[in-house]
Amino acid sequence: MKIIAVGMNYAQHNKELGHTQVNTEPVIFMKPDSAILKDGKPFFIPDFSNEIHYETELVVRINRLGKNIAPRFANRYYDAVTVGIDFTARDLQRKFREQRNPWELCKGFDSSAAIGTFVPVEHYKDIQN
């Protein structure tokens, strides 16, 4: 499984973190398979960070290959959703941002992406709302 994540997409949280810049393009980052934490397994705080933050996320399972999909066809490319928790080593992230370095170490460490059980989209009356 590949995790493609969109960062900086919640304006209120961006303000809480002191970010005033409005992004016109999405901030994309990836998480490796080893980041996935499933089936009620415990999360252990890593020893390389003194500041682990967490955010609740909507997780969408992509079920078809595609590229540059028009928004009106997007619903054809996913089949299930769940809730997840994105853990971030915030102290490292600040340092990496200042140095303009990638986020992998602060976002993609082992067990940094807790995900629930996927629920088929048919179980929801209006998945867009």
State what each model feature region is:
Residues M1-N129:
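Catalytic-core "active-site belt" of small-molecule-metabolizing enzymes
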